[in-house]
Amino acid sequence: MKIILANPRGFCAGVDRAISIVELALEIHGAPIYVRHEVVHNRFVVNGLRERGAIFVEELDEVPNGAIVIFSAHGVSQAVRQEAKERNLKVFDATCPLVTKVHMQVARASRKGTKAILIGHEGHPEVIGTMGQYDNDKGGIYLVEDVEDIAKLTLRNDEDITFMTQTTLSIDDTAGVIEVLKQKYPAIQGPRKNDICYATTNRQQAVRELAKLSDLVIVVGSKNSSNSNRLAELASRMGVTAKLIDDANDIEVSWLDNVTVIGLTAGASAPEILVQSVISRLKELGVDKVEELEGCEENTVFEVPKELRIKEVE
């Protein structure tokens, strides 16, 4: 048996930045540091930060007045920002800049009173935060997950309408939804460039190539990670057995029956250390060769807030 590694895989720039913000806040200010929602959707990462003194909460009422709080990479609503301000919380914002870009699109629509349609998964924290950028009773924001939801929309064609998307969606599914949306509302406006982020796009393309070569695709990522789920779904749609695992302990020996080539990748919030532990476990189970696809190079870097940049000693 051999493993073929997808490339790129694992951490994206937004996740790197979010984790660095928590680590630097702990280093500079000391524990406890409060984090609203899991900073990224990965159990290993969250547990590691918790051990270092990060306290993860779902709502700000769990944070003492005046404390330091970090907003997760998924972003928050304007109401959450206002609550933090009113309670004098010291905020470090780990919202991915590419999510912030979508927030700005929604805020612009809100200011103009333009009706906004967000394509995304109901209940996902990124979607909740993005919907929460709209604050204009003269307009409105509407969530659609699939083409069936579009049929339920009752907006008129003579209204100003714009759309935007969650950043971690399936490229193929979203393209289909946008096509139907444009058929129903021919004058609808949208972003010049797709809101699905570069990392989601690159990792899905890498899995597309990986699935062509594999008998089994293993995706390292947590069950609540949107982009990790999309990778497993994509491989499965291409006719390959796909498994989403948190770590090497989730691997079942029976998966390897009649398998010659294992494709291995990781979601954007899964660290490389987990990939390496999976490789080690698979070697114990008979893998004797590891290859890596060439893939595309990623060089995107997002800076942490200036208050957290540690100056080098001269």
From Swiss-Prot:
Residue numbers annotated as active site: 126 (proton donor)
InterPro entries, alphabetized: LytB/IspH
Top EC class, one word: oxidoreductase
Keyword 4Fe-4S found: yes
Domain of life the protein comes from: Bacteria
Needed cofactors: [4Fe-4S] cluster
Gene Ontology biological-process entries: dimethylallyl diphosphate biosynthetic process; isopentenyl diphosphate biosynthetic process, methylerythritol 4-phosphate pathway; terpenoid biosynthetic process
Pathway assigned in UniProt: Isoprenoid biosynthesis; dimethylallyl diphosphate biosynthesis; dimethylallyl diphosphate from (2E)-4-hydroxy-3-methylbutenyl diphosphate: step 1/1; Isoprenoid biosynthesis; isopentenyl diphosphate biosynthesis via DXP pathway; isopentenyl diphosphate from 1-deoxy-D-xylulose 5-phosphate: step 6/6
Annotated (2E)-4-hydroxy-3-methylbut-2-enyl diphosphate binding sites: 41, 74, 124, 167, 225-227, 269
Keywords: 4Fe-4S, Iron, Iron-sulfur, Isoprene biosynthesis, Metal-binding, Oxidoreductase
Cited NCBIfam families: ispH_lytB (TIGR00216), PRK01045.1-2 (NF002188), PRK01045.1-4 (NF002190)
Organism: Histophilus somni (strain 2336) (Haemophilus somnus)
Family to which this protein belongs: Belongs to the IspH family.
UniProt binding sites for [4Fe-4S] cluster: 12, 96, 197
Gene name for this UniProt entry: ispH
Cofactor annotation remark: Binds 1 [4Fe-4S] cluster per subunit.
Stored PANTHER family: 4-HYDROXY-3-METHYLBUT-2-ENYL DIPHOSPHATE REDUCTASE
Lineage: Bacteria, Pseudomonadati, Pseudomonadota, Gammaproteobacteria, Pasteurellales
Residues that hold dimethylallyl diphosphate according to the record: 41, 74, 124, 225-227, 269
Protein name: 4-hydroxy-3-methylbut-2-enyl diphosphate reductase
EC number in record: 1.17.7.4
Annotated function: Catalyzes the conversion of 1-hydroxy-2-methyl-2-(E)-butenyl 4-diphosphate (HMBPP) into a mixture of isopentenyl diphosphate (IPP) and dimethylallyl diphosphate (DMAPP). Acts in the terminal step of the DOXP/MEP pathway for isoprenoid precursor biosynthesis.
